[in-house]
């Protein structure tokens, strides 16, 4: 979002900014119109007050029409209500010299960097939110985004108070929530978020995901939309992130700049995910918690959901982690460390705070498996014992997380030490002190304290099927 309050900067920069709020509603309205609708009443000589009044009325009408209000040209209650609604700092009508008509990136692969983090949320949550916000746009375009940790990125994300060095000071809690710059070098493309807001991942405070999707839309070249259903609508409104979808208006706008998604040529006819997760014969390749969510891996994609939530989301593995292969065979999370381990054939990957660690993949034999083991069928971390259980054919191994060593006297037979469980195991999930052992279209709830199966369920029961 690039727009300028100082005329000399209009030629070179395109960003949103905010000054101190005036003392009365009339002055505030003039400030709002100059800030967001290119009202330039302060440039009209004092002797031409009639011209000034006419211009102000025209700008009020323009603003009212944009927001779908009754067009009166008067500063009425509904108009003031919109003006006082929290919003994006980018202008709705920009000076013709401030921004080219169509601004876009001229490359498909873009980098982003989170320069600093808000203290309102866990770093892992912020990372995940921006990853998902970028994915919203990559899902409907050929664009691909990669996070970097140092150096200059195409898109830099910054949390800041007040004056933060770009001529567009934040105004404190409420008012403008964030601003961004249209594509280009240097500061162009960057997105700034007002640290005075209380950033959250819920309906309380200001939802970071929703604002991030909006601002990144600007970073990719989108202007504001006057369609209230569009994520590019200027004012903030809460939508549940788990059920959020881009409007047809948003998809049309972004694809007019970049086109539709390009099929991944590395996927050899992978097919489509099942039309419903409730298919009676559906099985999973791996299942694990990831933070407060549960991931269900299948072929080249995975479903994820919050326990207890009715919403189910589906994502390709490559869009989440471009360096991770499809066909994950086993997975587990060490929640206290925010570490996720993914296994395929004789290799495994470490995902730390949702970011793949460098120097991976590594060989599963470095964990202590003999050369005869060529792949892991399933894995699960037991936080009470601080042990990882690896299931391979009819046997299982136990790995000590504290010692980082495979326990002695292993492998052991699954059928002997897990009564009621017969090989082969597809996936194992630890949830609320129980193991959920997936075998084909069914799962067995296993109580490790009682050493017995306590329930038999459909594999898809997690989805309310």
Swiss-Prot record:
Cofactor binding notes: Binds 4 Ca(2+) ions per subunit.
Annotated binding of Ca(2+) 1, by residue: 120, 195, 197
Residue window of motif Cysteine switch: 86-93
Swiss-Prot/TrEMBL keywords: Calcium, Disulfide bond, Extracellular matrix, Glycoprotein, Hydrolase, Metal-binding, Metalloprotease, Protease, Repeat, Secreted, Signal, Zinc, Zymogen
The Hemopexin repeat ranges on this chain: 281-324, 325-371, 373-421, 422-465
SUPFAM superfamilies in the record: Hemopexin-like domain, Metalloproteases ('zincins'), catalytic domain, PGBD-like
Its EC number(s): 3.4.24.65
Cellular compartments annotated: Secreted, Extracellular space, Extracellular matrix
Similarity remark: Belongs to the peptidase M10A family.
Protein name: Macrophage metalloelastase
Natural source organism: Rattus norvegicus (Rat)
Native organism taxonomy: Eukaryota, Metazoa, Chordata, Craniata, Vertebrata
